Amino acid sequence: MEFSPRAAELTTLLESRITNFYTNFQVDEIGRVISVGDGIARVYGLNEIQAGEMVEFASGVKGIALNLENENVGIVVFGSDTAIKEGDLVKRTGSIVDVPAGKSLLGRVVDALGVPIDGRGALGDHERRRVEVKVPGIIERKSVHEPMQTGLKAVDSLVPIGRGQRELIIGDRQTGKTAIAIDTILNQKQMNSRATSESETLYCVYVAIGQKRSTVAQLVQILSEGNALEYSILVAATASDPAPLQFLAPYSGCAMGEYFRDNGMHALIIYDDLSKQAVAYRQMSLLLRRPPGREAFPGDVFYLHSRLLERAAKRSDQTGAGSLTALPVIETQAGDVSAYIPTNVISITDGQICLETELFYRGIRPAINVGLSVSRVGSAAQLKAMKQVCGSLKLELAQYREVAAFAQFGSDLDAATQALLNRGARLTEILKQPQYAPLPIEKQIIVIYAAVNGFCDRMPLDRISQYERAIPQSVKQELLQSLVEKGGLNNERKIEPDAFLKENAKPYIKG
C-alpha cells in the first residue's frame, strides 16, 4: 500500500505538532477534610506536606500544618472555621509562612500575616521573610557594647540596656509595663534626630498580642502624636483574632525586625505580652491532642519562647554590625514570679525589670523594684559618666529599703541612720517620672548627679520634683554635652556642675 502525497503531508504535520507540543502542567497535592472544629481541621491525603507549611481551604481560608501524624495532618485555621465542611478539598501552597519586611512597613499597622489593617492601602516595595528562621550562630555575634536609651532615669541608671540585649519587663496587670515600652519608643525620636548615619538610627517594632483593639488604636494615636510612627511598625493580633494568629504574631514581628538587624541597622522589638502568646499556644496544643505538662502547657513551651528571644542579637562587624534588641513583657498573677512562664522567660533573657503593684499605688512610678531588677549585660554598654554617677545609687537605695523596714518600729534613730533615710527618700523621689515624658541621657546624668552628691538633702520632699524640672531647663547645653562626650567625670570636670547645682538648689532649700 502506497502513501499518497496527502497522507505523507499529514504525517509530517502531526509529527511537527507533537514535537512542538508543550503545556504547562500545574500539579497540586490536595487532601480532604476529615473533621473540623474549634479552629482545628484534620486533613487526609497530604502525604508530602512540611511542618509549618501554609495550606488553603476551598473556602479561601488559610491554615498552617502543625501536627504531622500517620493517618492525617492537624491544621490550625487562620480565621473562622465555619466555612469549612467535612469533605472539602485542601490544597498545599508549598511555602512556609512568610511575611513582608522592609522600610515600607514603617508607620503601618499590620496583622500577624503582614496584611495592613490601618486602612491606608497596600504596602510599598518590600521583600518577604520566613517567620521561623535559624538564629545567628556564636561566631556571627558580638558582645553587647552600645547603649539603648529608654529615657527613663530608673532604667538607664540602674538596669541599663544595650543594643542586642533581651530585657524582660515583668509585673502584675496595671503596673505600667506597656508604659515603659512606649516611653522607650518615644525616646528614640530625639535619639534618631541626632543620628548622623543610618547605623545610629533605631527602628522600633511593637507586637500587640491578645490586647483590646481600642488599646492598639490608643497606642497608634500616642505614637503619631509623638511623631514616633515614622520609625515604628505595629503588629497587632488582638483579643478577637484566632489563637493561631496570636501565636504567630511575635515571630512575624521578629522577622520584620531581623530585616534591619541583617542589613547593618538597629531595631528594637517589644512583645506585649508573651503570657498571652503562651496561652494561645496552649489552646492550640490541647486542641491538637498534644500531651499537657505543668499548668497544662505543652512540653515545648520553653522552646516556643527561647527560639523567639534568641533571634535578638548584636551582630559582629564582619556580618554588618546590626542589632535586634528585645523587650518581652510578661504578666504575673499576684506578683508570683516563680510561676512556669515567668521563670522560663527570666532564664532566657539577659535581665529583668520587675514592677510592683504596691510601689505603683504608693506613687512611685515607674514602679520598679530596684532589688529584684537586674541587667546582666547592659552595664558594659552604659555611658562612662552615667556609670560613675550611679555607682553608689543602687547600694544607697538597697540600704535605704533595709533601714526603712526597721525605722517604722522606733523613732529614736542615730544621725547616720537618719541621714540614710533622708537620702534614700530623696533618691526615690528623683527617680520618679511622669508617663510619656522620656528624658535625654545627658539631662538624666545631671539630675541623678545632683541627688547622689547631696544637693537635694536639705530640700523638702515636695519641692524635689520642681527642682528636678528646673535643672534641665536652666543648664547650659555645653555642660550637658561635656558630660556625655568627654568620657566621664574627674575632679576637674566636677567643678562646673557642682557650682551650677549648688546655685540652682538655693531657692528650694528650706530656710
UniProtKB/Swiss-Prot annotation:
The lineage of its organism: Eukaryota, Viridiplantae, Streptophyta, Embryophyta, Tracheophyta. Keywords: ATP synthesis, ATP-binding, CF(1), Hydrogen ion transport, Ion transport, Membrane, Mitochondrion, Mitochondrion inner membrane, Nucleotide-binding, Transport. It comes from Oenothera biennis (German evening primrose). This is ATP synthase subunit alpha, mitochondrial. Its main location: mitochondrion. The record marks 373 as: Required for activity. F-type ATPases have 2 components, CF(1) - the catalytic core - and CF(0) - the membrane proton channel. CF(1) has five subunits: alpha(3), beta(3), gamma(1), delta(1), epsilon(1). CF(0) has three main subunits: a, b and c. GO terms for molecular function: ADP binding; ATP binding; proton-transporting ATP synthase activity, rotational mechanism. Mitochondrial membrane ATP synthase (F(1)F(0) ATP synthase or Complex V) produces ATP from ADP in the presence of a proton gradient across the membrane which is generated by electron transport complexes of the respiratory chain. F-type ATPases consist of two structural domains, F(1) - containing the extramembraneous catalytic core, and F(0) - containing the membrane proton channel, linked together by a central stalk and a peripheral stalk. During catalysis, ATP synthesis in the catalytic domain of F(1) is coupled via a rotary mechanism of the central stalk subunits to proton translocation. It is found in: Mitochondrion; Mitochondrion inner membrane.
